[in-house]
């Protein structure tokens, strides 16, 4: 006797659609707390796979406020800058290093395996969340890694800040560091603030000390890409020394005229040794996303 099942067949597309419907229904039936626990578990497994013993120093994806929210990109960003520190900046294991805008440790992680006990790493940031996170994870394991929050005003990142950037003196003595790093800091600062910070960098650097600072630089090439719509950032609002993506909140992202930046360096006595242009504006040949300016204190 036939049950009529011989004609009930599914093609691959139908089977796939049915499977997706079942999975969608299953997800709807799982309570939210269980979903969150599963997500945390999978996230921790992924961290362990990517970072090994350093996994406790890596924030959750939703905590990565200082760049792309992806574990793979967090790892890639850190490794990329670590190579730049060594190959371009000549960073040695026993140096005194200042990281202005240290974030949540994106560029700090590889340094824990490179800087020795004679080295000193000082990081500061306007974001208290990142500073507290790094203090808890890094400083407890590596006593020569220090982090502090600076209560400096920034319209985008710290609108309630107590001090104006032009008033803030870095909390270090003159010639305290042989290497200073600023990643994606001057891309969020107005001209007067940038000039003051650059002077402070010069002050805290030793003679012959180096600094690496990232920018969005305006020159003939980048302007051509911007005006043709190829740039990843729509720097449409033009001012005397810079362009920005927002007239109301220019600190959201600022690109400076390369010539103006070069003049600031010359005026202070910072000799630009190398300039590597980034991919941000749509150029095809680049080293990193932002433009990198490497200079030495004369």
What is each stretch, according to the model?
Residues 190-191:
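Helix-capping/helix-break motifs at membrane-protein junctions
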Residues 184-185:
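Short catalytic micro-motifs in class I SAM-dependent methyltransferases
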Residues 195-207:
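A short glycine-rich, Lys/Arg-flanked "PGG" loop and its adjoining helix->strand segment in the class I
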Residues 181:
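A conserved beta-strand element that flanks and buttresses the S-adenosyl-L-methionine
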Residues 112, 116:
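Gly/Ala-rich phosphate-binding loop of Rossmann-like dinucleotide-binding domains
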Residues 100:
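Conserved beta-strand/loop positions that form the S-adenosyl-L-methionine
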Residues 2-12, 16, 20-24, 28, ...:
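Class I (Rossmann-like) S-adenosyl-L-methionine-dependent methyltransferase catalytic domain
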